[in-house]
Amino acid sequence: MTINITKTKERPVFPFTAIVGQEEMKLALTLNVIDPKIGGVIIMGDRGTGKSTTIRAITDILPEIPIVENDPFNSHPQDFDLMSDEVRSRIEKGESIPSVMKKVSMIDLPLGATEDRVCGTIDIEKALTEGVKAFEPGLLAKANRGILYVDEVNLLDDHLVDILLDSAASGWNTVEREGISIRHPARFVLVGSGNPEEGELRPQLLDRFGMHSEIRTVRDPELRVKIVEQRSEFDKNPSACLETYKNQQTEFKQRIIQAQKVLPTVELDYDLRIRISKICGELDVDGLRGDIVTNRAAKAHAAFNGKQTVTVDDIKAVITMCLRHRLRKDPLETIDSGSKVQKVFEDIFADLM
């Protein structure tokens, strides 16, 4: 008996530009895609508000990237900071490196994942008997130059969250076993989502996420009806729905590509940087991550809107998401919705508004 296996097409993804009512979450994801050094985003909100749908939708819209063919780490064919040691040594020997274009990958990290599954494993027996570094790549290798998504991140083991955040911040994953060490690039946008009713992350871990997006269930009945209709249309005929939003998707993709190009040249005036740091000081934010992330996010926002210089509007659009999860609070309090940050912002920027 012969079984014919046909290659199935990729499952259609709900178009990013069709998602309505969750603008803060969409903006946070977009800015992290433009500048991954912002440090990722944690999205907390009610069940059934489209968190997972939106995250998968942003991945589908991203431009393709060049990678070294058959490389498990998605190494860049030219950029030494984004390639594995093996590819680098091949280039230094003068070998020809074939490359292909590939869609940006989105890797799901399951809650039950072990450290070996996340980081990868070294075959100690092979290393000792044959003298070669036999490495089985983990999820961090697959996520290099892509998006790593952790649903219900607040339920993930703290030790694993630490590993993810360390790799996201340094851009490298190092695996050490029995005196053998292997490292590979792990530059990814870390996106976590969860329901605050199921528990919050520790403040030390929360602070490591660049941005915090808070989403609530849409209450406006007309908007709710619109969302339900859109979803029903997509489920009934995905290809027709995708065709409807094709031009908007293409335009959005071009805006991201252009923003990534101009980002290095975007300027943020010294006076505005001083005011951002004043806000962080007034809010009693620990450390300097708040200042750094706000500066980066404001520049990314300016680039996304085609500007060469950051304005007050750019800072206003991002500062709440950059700081709300860094405020000191009592253990029984929930994370501030943003009213404290906005009040201090308005006080310090009053003369420029």
UniProtKB/Swiss-Prot annotation:
GO MF annotations, alphabetized: ATP binding; ATP hydrolysis activity; magnesium chelatase activity
Main location: plastid
GO biological process assignments: chlorophyll biosynthetic process; photosynthesis
Pfam families found in the cross-reference section: AAA_lid_2 (PF17863), Mg_chelatase (PF01078)
Reactions mediated catalytically: protoporphyrin IX + Mg(2+) + ATP + H2O = Mg-protoporphyrin IX + ADP + phosphate + 3 H(+)
Catalytic activity, EC: 6.6.1.1
InterPro entries on file: AAA+_ATPase, CHLI-like, ChlI/MoxR_AAA_lid, Mg_chelatase_ATPase-isu, Mg_chelatse_chII-like_cat_dom, P-loop_NTPase
Cellular compartments annotated: Plastid, Chloroplast
A single cellular component GO annotation: chloroplast
Positions of ATP binding: 45-52
Signal peptide residue numbers: none
Keywords annotated in UniProt: ATP-binding, Chlorophyll biosynthesis, Chloroplast, Ligase, Nucleotide-binding, Photosynthesis, Plastid
Pathway it works in: Porphyrin-containing compound metabolism; chlorophyll biosynthesis
SMART domains the record matches: AAA
PANTHER family recorded: MAGNESIUM-CHELATASE SUBUNIT CHLI, MAGNESIUM-CHELATASE SUBUNIT CHLI-2, CHLOROPLASTIC
Family indicated by similarity: Belongs to the Mg-chelatase subunits D/I family.
Function summary: Involved in chlorophyll biosynthesis; introduces a magnesium ion into protoporphyrin IX to yield Mg-protoporphyrin IX.
Protein name: Magnesium-chelatase subunit ChlI
Source organism of this protein record: Guillardia theta (Cryptophyte)
Gene behind this protein: chlI
